[in-house]
Amino acid sequence: MGLQGQLSDVSSDSIPLMLLSLLAVFINHLRSFLLRLTSKSNPNLPVDDVSIASGLANIIVLADQLSLNRLFSYRCGDGGGGGSDCVVCLSKLKEGEEVRKLECRHVFHKKCLEGWLHQFNFTCPLCRSALVSDDCVSKTQRSVGRDLISCFSLH
């Protein structure tokens, strides 16, 4: 009858999308319920938005630095750095190895610098000069904080 005609109009691709949207609505309601429940049971429980925003901002800065590491790395011998030591792994930089020269002019193995960055060290491993300005990090933190507030604000 009328119901069968309507079901045949629904594409099989749209059914998973409808289920996904229903799941998203359910999760949103569950999150709202749990937030109300926890705020009633412990009103002194602080929500540390600053540390969440700071952590996410660090991840964004890390992604930017890893991207720069890929873009600005080169083979040793192409742009200098041969014969010196990588202070991260304490090995000699050999011709043909992938290296990266920082703004402070220090050269490291690309993989060693990636490992350094993965520990959220945004300074030169040798002289500790900043790879990212404090202003850039605080801008990213403010931007992430604003995005978090708009994304997770209760309606």
UniProtKB/Swiss-Prot annotation:
> Quaternary state and partners of this protein?
Interacts with NAC019 and NAC055.
For molecular function, the Gene Ontology terms on record are:
ubiquitin-protein transferase activity; zinc ion binding
Name it: E3 ubiquitin-protein ligase RHA2A
Listed pathway(s): Protein modification; protein ubiquitination
Tissues expressing the protein: Expressed in stems, flowers, cauline leaves, rosettes, siliques, seeds and roots.
**What is the predominant subcellular site recorded for this chain?**
cytoplasm
Q: Which E.C. number(s) belong to this protein? A: 2.3.2.27
Where, per UniProt, does this protein localize?
Cytoplasm; Nucleus
Keyword annotations:
Abscisic acid signaling pathway, Cytoplasm, Metal-binding, Nucleus, Stress response, Transferase, Ubl conjugation pathway, Zinc, Zinc-finger
Q: What happens when the gene is disrupted?
A: Decreased sensitivity to ABA and salt and osmotic stresses during seed germination and early seedling development.
Taxonomically, the superkingdom here is Eukaryota
Domain-related comment = The ring domain is sufficient for the interaction with ANAC. Presence of both a nuclear localization sequence (NLS) and a nuclear export sequence (NES).
First and last residues of each zinc finger (RING-type): 86-128
Q: Its encoding gene is what?
A: RHA2A
Q: What does this protein do?
A: E3 ubiquitin-protein ligase involved in the positive regulation of abscisic acid (ABA) signaling and responses to salt and osmotic stresses during seed germination and early seedling development. Acts additively with RHA2B in regulating ABA signaling and drought response. Possesses E3 ubiquitin ligase activity in vitro.
UniProt effect for mutating residue 103 to P? Decreased affinity for ANAC
The reaction(s) annotated as catalysed by this protein in its Swiss-Prot or TrEMBL entry are: S-ubiquitinyl-[E2 ubiquitin-conjugating enzyme]-L-cysteine + [acceptor protein]-L-lysine = [E2 ubiquitin-conjugating enzyme]-L-cysteine + N(6)-ubiquitinyl-[acceptor protein]-L-lysine
- Coiled coil ranges (UniProt) are none
